[in-house]
Amino acid sequence: PSEYFAKYVFNRQKMYKYLPSDVYEKLIDVIDNGTRLDRSIADAVAAGMKLWAEENGVTHYTHWFQPLTEGTAEKHDAFVEHDGKGGMIEEFSGKLLVQQEPDASSFPNGGIRNTFEARGYSAWDPTSPVFIIDDTLCIPTIFISYTGEALDYKAPLLRSLHTLSEAATEVCHYFYPQVKKVQTNLGWEQEYFLVDESLYSARPDLMLTGRTLMGHDSAKNQQMDDHYFGTIPERVQAFMKDLEIQALELGIPCKTRHNEVAPNQFELAPIYEECNLAVDHNMLLMSLMKRVAHKHSFRVLLHEKPFAGVNGSGKHNNWSLCTDTG
């Protein structure tokens, strides 16, 4: 796994290779210390990203954000512009990397704005690395209204992590004056059900809502306690292996897989990561699970209670604080 881990992620190793040394150092300072992004380096960063992306067959880019829909959103744009001579050239500027203006009128907003106030802004989050899905360069971003209100889950999370670091650092100074910041770590556990695609297609309630709304208990539920940590079925294990390979290529550090308590319920858990990155990886993994499951003639159910009479799927969040001194 270490050979292909983060193969499609513009991580620090890729940054060091594709960026000028002074640009690399400034960008690392932004990531590690939260300093303000210098717009003067944006063009150089964008050029490095584009070069790496094109070497991996990428033709499009997108600002990848998390609106209030319990999923992710993206709009793909090609790396093409007119060259002024009747032809086209590939182009990706720092301006396109740092900020875009997607239409925000049709996203949930909690009633804080009118529908006709359509403008929204997506802004690059440098602390979460850029990655490649198929032929698209995905740039993690926050999503806000033109008046500054958050229209996503990432912006409030980043604000809370900053506030928590400041408060925790003040406490640490009573004991360790050398502490400069406190990082929040997160290890999530993704539980899910797998259903054969043919059986899924026979249930309109599953197709429309992702859970059962009618029917009765199956002949055997979880009374025998024989599914938890049991032998993983061969077909399910093939799905898990495929999922883990693709997840590792996207930098998601998958660690544990096993049968859960309910029949056809399973779990995947990663190694702890910085909280913002861990949340991005969980959102990415849930999207990836659906794609890989379809390839193996499964449908994955992520609803917290898809079946009555058996355990639901929780998402335990193992949360901790860590100082910059270790």
What are these regions (language model features)?
Residues 3-94, 98-114:
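Histidine/acidic residue-rich metal-binding segments in metalloenzymes
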Residues 2, 56-57, 184, 258:
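Alpha-helical protein-protein interaction elements
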Residues 118-303, 307-326:
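Glycine-rich, acidic/polar active-site loops that bind/position phosphate-bearing ligands
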Residues 1-24, 119-139:
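Catalytic pocket of metal/acid-base enzymes, prominently hydrolases
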